[in-house]
Design a protein with these regions (language model features):
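Glycine- and charge-rich intrinsically disordered segments
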Residues: 1-19, 202-230
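Binding-interface segments
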Residues: 2-201
Length: 230
């Protein structure tokens, strides 16, 4: 299975039309090695027909995302394999393709008792956050920030109610990630919403087509070895 999959991916990646659609810094050998390793470690993926599996894997190649490093997921769903960038992958795409160059993207949860304020000052967004040290108070919301090279920022905020609404529509709402790492999952939700609001200048038509696929972007992970991509 591994050798056959590697050969199929190599053949696909060497097609002239595909080569033109890949990112300029794409590492074919590393992508094939990491992707084959991922499929070998996942029984559900290894059982999928290659006709269903390979198209999902190729979406990661077109975007320059690494499945094995948790930048994107190939998710068995019925008789299909669904592709989805992780929040780590969304951050990478935003940094690589933002029309307005970025220096950093980060997110925090806000707990009861933390000092938090966001607004506009002189036409520029701002955020002020002072968390209580070692606080285990209830989470009341989350925010994410994109910092631009020109000094500006973009802020996304979500209340606890909005975060929980996102959880309810997630296919993973009963999974271990939400149960044991809710803070990380809240950060994931708000970062993904932030990244979707950043204007991207994709290199190829194929990349733009994948990013415009609402199902690919909005779908939630079921059960993946590392749900946070870290």
């Amino acid at each position: 299975m591994a050798e056959e999959l590697g050969m199929v991916l190599t053949s696909e990646l060497n097609r002239p039309s595909v080569m033109e659609a890949l990112p300029s810094n794409f590492n074919r050998a590393r992508f094939i090695q990491n992707t084959v390793a991922l499929v070998q470690s996942n029984e559900d993926l290894s059982r999928m027909p290659q006709a269903k599996l390979v198209p999902a894997l190729m979406k990661g190649a077109y975007l320059g995302l690494d499945f094995f490093n948790g930048e994107c997921y190939a998710i068995p769903y019925g008789q299909q394999v669904q592709f989805m960038p992780s929040y780590k992958g969304m951050v990478k795409l935003a940094k690589n393709f933002s029309k307005r160059p970025l220096t950093d993207i980060y997110a925090h949860v806000v707990r009861d008792g933390d000092e938090f304020e966001t607004g506009m000052d002189g036409g520029q967004e701002y955020v002020r956050f002072k968390p209580k040290t070692f606080s285990d108070a209830p989470i009341i919301g989350a925010f994410a920030v994109a910092q631009y090279v020109d000094g500006g920022i973009k802020v996304e905020t979500m209340s606890k109610a909005q975060l929980d609404a996102a959880k309810r529509v997630s296919k993973a709402q009963s999974g271990t990630a939400w149960k044991f790492f809710p803070e990380e999952m809240y950060r994931k939700v708000v970062i993904r919403r932030l990244c979707k609001g950043i204007d991207l200048n994709m290199e190829t038509v194929e990349q733009a087509r994948i990013m415009q696929d609402d199902d690919a972007i909005e779908a939630e992970v079921t059960e993946v070895d590392n749900p946070f991509g870290d």
